[in-house]
Regions:
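Conserved AMP-binding A3 loop
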Residues: 1-9
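Conserved AMP-binding/adenylation subdomain of ANL enzymes
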Residues: 8-25, 33-74, 88
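Active-site phosphate/pyrophosphate- and oxyanion-stabilizing loops and adjacent acidic/basic residues
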Residues: 12, 115, 152
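Gly/Ser/Thr-rich phosphate-binding loop
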Residues: 18, 47, 64, 69-77, ...
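Alpha-helix capping/helix-boundary segments
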Residues: 59, 81-82, 109
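Adenylate-forming AMP-binding core of the ANL superfamily, especially NRPS adenylation
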Residues: 108, 147-162
Length: 162
């Protein structure tokens, strides 16, 4: 069962894991009717005082333009969203250097894609595993683990209980 306590804590602890501050700007292109948007994005920003840069609907060009124009420091998405952004013919026209972090979740996250995102978008990828009923994140790679181990070595997000 989802409670205010676990939704608030999940958003807060995810932000802590990603070192969010009030200086961050999160580009939100995931749906707000889903736990990815409402907990990992909205609650994260509410508990850390971050700015949310809302994209009306997912369109790789709109996302790239929003990150570029607003100088976003974080970006969330599922693997297919990142593939669409990286493969967009106008990708090289946008400055992604303001990005420092983001979440890739919702599906298996290929290590090669995570490497491409880090190289081309300059952001450290946090791959979160969870489920809606857990509000939603349960595990994420420990911050000391290198990307090559991201697919196999995970740490439980703080305060997770049975």
């Amino acid at each position: 069962m989802l409670t205010h306590y676990n939704i608030s804590n999940n958003g807060f602890l995810t932000g802590e894991h990603m070192k969010f501050t009030s200086d961050d700007k999160l580009c939100v292109c995931v749906p707000l009717f889903h736990c990815f948007g409402v907990v990992l994005a909205t609650m994260n920003c509410l508990t850390h005082g971050c700015t949310q840069v809302m994209v009306e609907r997912f369109d790789p060009l709109l996302v790239l333009a929003s990150v570029h124009k607003e100088r976003c420091t974080a970006l969330y998405g599922v693997p297919t969203m990142f593939i669409a952004e990286l493969n967009h013919p106008m990708f090289d026209m946008f400055d992604m250097s303001s990005l420092r972090t983001g979440i890739m979740a919702g599906s298996l996250c290929p290590v090669e894609l995570m490497k491409r995102v880090e190289e081309k978008m300059f952001m450290k990828v946090t791959s979160v595993y969870g489920l809606t009923e857990a509000s939603p994140g349960m595990t994420a790679p420990a911050s000391t683990i290198r990307l090559m181990y991201a697919a196999t070595r995970w740490a439980v997000i703080s305060s997770l209980r049975k």
